[in-house]
Amino acid sequence: MLGAHAIEVGPLGMLAINISLLAMVGWALLRAERGLPDGREWTLLAMLAIFGIFGRVLLEPLPNIQPVTVLVLLVGVHMGAKRSIALAAVIALGSNMLMGHGLWTLYQALGWSLVGCLGAFAATHLNTLPRIAGAAALCGFLFDWVISLSILHTLGPSMLPAYIIAGLPFDLLHAMGNLFFAAWLASPLADIINRHQVVTL
């Protein structure tokens, strides 16, 4: 399974991936900046990015358990889609610069961006810990399935269902890890964001 993600893209392909990720971060930051009341929320986002990057790197020995999915979901809920997209792309690129960067980085950025957007669009319903935890668990599966699409570059669509089924134990680990991180982070992160009076856009 791991070999399916080890795609040789060459220098030009890697440049295209890096430009795509940079464009994603730039677009999200520029769009979000238009409604920026002050600079404090950017400091908060930078701190969350650092936490997400180091959380992912340090928890690498635990298969598919990391705080990033929950962080991006909660930023989507409390700060909006644009800021969650920026956070998702920065964490994906920043952590993969340490762990290994390639085509999968783009899929991770897209998967976490989708999680953040879902958090933003469902924000009015994600107002209790059980709902946030349930959404976080489901987002573990969603993120992993988006990442699985990267095998289409090497194995083709006929292998995708088998690949997803083979990955279900790892998806379950991701979902369980997300339950833990949601219980740990949901309330404190909401309090921190509210203290900075961030307006959802």
Task: For the regions a language model picked out, list residue spans one by one.
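Membrane-interfacial loop-to-transmembrane alpha-helix junctions, especially the N-terminal start
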Residues: 37-45, 80-84, 132-133
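Small-residue-rich segments of transmembrane alpha-helices in multi-pass membrane proteins
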Residues: 45-51, 76-78, 139-146
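Membrane-embedded alpha-helical hairpins and interfacial helices in multi-pass inner-membrane proteins
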Residues: 1-19, 105-109, 121, 125-201
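Generic transmembrane alpha-helix motif of multi-pass integral membrane proteins
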Residues: 68-84, 118-123
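Alpha-helical transmembrane segments of multi-pass membrane proteins
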Residues: 69, 73, 109-116, 179, ...
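Hydrophobic transmembrane alpha-helices
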Residues: 2-74
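Interfacial aromatic-anchored transmembrane helix boundaries in multi-pass membrane proteins
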Residues: 53-66, 89-123, 155
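Central hydrophobic cores of alpha-helical transmembrane segments
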Residues: 48, 84-95, 131-141
